[in-house]
């Protein structure tokens, strides 16, 4: 039985991927609804008109009077809740909600809920693979891959969900079995008033959670609320009670739980300290929902990482080339620079720049000075990054990604790595971060 009242009228606001999943969910349950989108030709309009021709749809500027016909608006995550028409509707008593809230009301299996500024997709995918290795019927999605509502099934034994701050803004009570915010650093400052507002949005993931997983190296990940729920921690330090971390024995580093060594770090296919942290976070989440260590370790030993996330491309003349195009904020770039920088004998030659989304870049200076041989700058906010780094290392300008890769090859020495980790969004020069990553890979593969 669907936990949704059928006597109310709803409007889906936003007709992208998640909006279309809402349309399917509501239509399949016979719920009365309409659709609105600020764009004249939203991405899923043709699909809506083909499959649901009787659903009313309004495209273009949002009409407050139209929105106020609804008892509830399901707002897609791409649309800011501060949009004046949405605020006007809310002021007149219309409830603002979203697909994750609706998913949580209807999910019958436990939910592993994962957010954070960085590493969400890697950890979400890894926990999903751990659950599959343990023989669980697992569904993985949310902000990653399949929209949440399309995952709902009576056959699912465990949901593993990546959730963005935008999705969490419209989620009142997730009621996850275990929830985590992996890390917090500035991101989406073009949408939030500052880090505190972004932090509060992320922490909505903990509402109703039965267990927490906390990064003990990032105080901002600790829940702001709690009533004695079990709390597991992860970090790169030595673990103690209810903690996952790193232990060293006879010169060998191990992933460990409490006082038990689980596996040598060298057996991980994913490189860098940041990926060791990701592995520990996944172990903590899996342990919280009862996944056996033997199955989780099988998944860890075979997991090779995700495309565009510190993805190894090739080695050439003693230099490794890595595609980290998904690093669309400073925190993600720092994780890659520090993680790879500490894992190699040489230095990092970094490609950075793009649309900075209003972020500050000053935190790049010291890690760049420590780990980088040179920085190749490109894109809209390259000057801002250059000002933040200053004279810490040589700065080289490039106008295209092909030019940037050529400059990297000239600057790199054997033992170095070339790293595309832009610390910026891609839309100033590319269709999306995937397009940027694919162009980088092609440029690297074309090197003779």
Curated annotation (Swiss-Prot):
**What UniProt keywords apply to this chain's record, in alphabetical order?**
ATP-binding, Cell cycle, Cell division, Cell shape, Cell wall biogenesis/degradation, Cytoplasm, Ligase, Nucleotide-binding, Peptidoglycan synthesis
| Chief location of this protein within or outside the cell | cytoplasm
What reaction gets catalysed by this protein? Answer: UDP-N-acetyl-alpha-D-muramoyl-L-alanine + D-glutamate + ATP = UDP-N-acetyl-alpha-D-muramoyl-L-alanyl-D-glutamate + ADP + phosphate + H(+)
GO BP annotations listed: cell division; cell wall organization; peptidoglycan biosynthetic process; regulation of cell shape
| Molecular-function GO terms, alphabetical | ATP binding; UDP-N-acetylmuramoylalanine-D-glutamate ligase activity
Quick one: signal sequence residues? none
Q: Which GO terms describe its cellular component?
A: cytoplasm
Q: Domain of life of the organism in this record?
A: Bacteria
Protein's UniProt keywords contain Ligase:
yes
The EC number(s) attached to this protein equal 6.3.2.9
Q: Which Pfam families match?
A: Mur_ligase_C, Mur_ligase_M, MurD-like_N
* Localization terms from the record: Cytoplasm
Q: In which pathway does it act?
A: Cell wall biogenesis; peptidoglycan biosynthesis
Entry similarity comment: Belongs to the MurCDEF family.
Q: What does this protein do?
A: Cell wall formation. Catalyzes the addition of glutamate to the nucleotide precursor UDP-N-acetylmuramoyl-L-alanine (UMA).
HAMAP family according to UniProt? MurD
Stated name of the protein = UDP-N-acetylmuramoylalanine--D-glutamate ligase
Its lineage opens with: Bacteria, Pseudomonadati, Pseudomonadota, Gammaproteobacteria, Pseudomonadales
